[in-house]
Amino acid sequence: MKKTITLLAMSLLAMSCCGEIVKTEVDVIPQPAEVAVYEGELDVAGASFKADKELGEMALKAIDKFEGQLVAASTKESGSAKAQFVFKTDKNLACEEYSIDVCCNKVVVKASGLNGVLYAIETIKQMLPEQIYTGAAACCEEWELPYMKIQDRPRFSYRGMHLDVSRHFFDMDEVKKYLDIMAIHKLNVFHWHLTDDQGWRLEMKTYPELTQVGAVRKQTLIGHGGRSRKYDGIPYGEGLYYTQEDVKEIIAYAAERGIEVIPEIDLPGHMLAALATFPELGCTGGPYDVWGRWGIADDVLCVGKESTMVFLENVLAEVAELFPSEYVHIGGDECPKVRWETCPHCQAKIAELGYKDDEKYKAEHYLQGYVTSRMEKFLAEKGKKLIGWDEILEGEIAPNATVMSWRGVEGGHEAAKLGHDAIMTPYTHLYLDYYQSKDVENEPFGIGGYLPVEIVYSFEPFTDDMTEEEKSHILGVQANLWTEYIPTNEHLEYMLLPRMSALSEIQWCQPENKIYERFLDNMDNMAEIYDILGYNYAKHIFND
């Protein structure tokens, strides 16, 4: 059936211009769904622009920006050539779908709104000289687009990238740069990991102490956590957090690029920054320190105390108010139960709820399920959906929770079988703090492992034994960038690129369009974009 639809689509493409199709691929990442390239080119230097106002204010702003870049880079005033860009509204297209038709003297772009317009512009920009990204004059370059027809849409609706800003903080300009890189690759979800044992990075009006105390650790571990107990002796984190005005600015910046921002408040584990601020939230009463090392701490929130649950609800209420995203991520990963096993408050709550050990889980796992379910219900009252790492499957999963599957694909598949939505982000393929080369002595520091571009690119979220119903619950794919060993933006970009390019084709392309050799050829063009934008990137695939 899919083959029939594709053949029909290609037939329609062939009818859109005179002549025969000469290519069915373009030098674009991610590769568009359906492409037909014909003989002939259109010089678009100095082209005029016309746009349908129904596309919306943000889409029109994006079109104006593109026009300005083209005028500046091609060194011709708008309207000095015969070519014209025409942006039209087509409500029959899905929100992220678009079409491009280059024929005669026109480039006709159709979309139903902002995201389709953004993706069409990005596709066009990648086919023009790289100076289009900076507006730098490039008078000697050829500003030609081939006669072509593109019909494009993403495979997955959720195309995410995560950033941990707790272990190491990245300022506003660096976060915006991260969003810019995402936009080039047509990613649409920024997962912002704002709290962890090593620092609380989000201003809370209800609890201002969380960034006064919880943002600052006394010192930081030198080297790998399992091999070293040496510390640098330097306090880290004073003033390193985002104000709520900062957050609003980032959300607006992301929205202009078609990106949704999902906040993560990791609970009930990974909470030493909060425990150091409010020791009464813990099982032992402390004292606690904002952690200066990496790994998993035994000290977690005392969820047997109602006061702890009220604290969590107050925090999440403020987060839900601040972030317009339909989702809030509550973590739920790596929460040791050792403190709960001996805590009178937690044991009393277990008894009250009637939890008991069984052949699959201990009672304490069900206690965490109680926390997740309560937070899910609370967030639902605020109009939000809950996401958690795949540990939330242990015990009783909250009724409407979305599972982020990081320990492999099994958690996502289990969630889908249970009728829950899932997002695939397995460490085996999508943890970008892993090394990109086996020659680790000559690589920037990583957490370990080996994850070159080829392995990233090879990831497929579906398995042959999945039913169509189960597949429908897989919302998409995300890569994660944990920053224990990534203290600078230069290091961050190196770990991110070019692996994000590989990620984008997993997220966007149908399996039949995912061809590694074609991808490598297209990466030469992408490297020119990286270079002109000044990005620091790993060059292994270009040296092979």
What are these regions (language model features)?
Residues 58, 169-171, 197-203, 268-274, ...:
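Flexible loop/turn segments at secondary-structure boundaries
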Residues 17-157, 380-393, 397, 524-534, ...:
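Acidic, contiguous N-terminal accessory segments
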Residues 274-280, 284, 289-401, 406-418:
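Active-site neighborhood of glycoside hydrolase catalytic domains
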Residues 45-51, 159-164, 233, 295-301, ...:
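Glycine- and acidic
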Residues 385-401, 406-544:
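Flexible, acidic glycine-rich loops studded with aromatic residues
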Residues 63-75, 186-187, 381-383, 418-422, ...:
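Structural alpha-beta junctions
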Residues 93-299, 303-309, 314-327, 374, ...:
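Feature activates predominantly on carbohydrate-active enzymes
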Residues 1-25:
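Bacterial Sec-dependent N-terminal signal peptides
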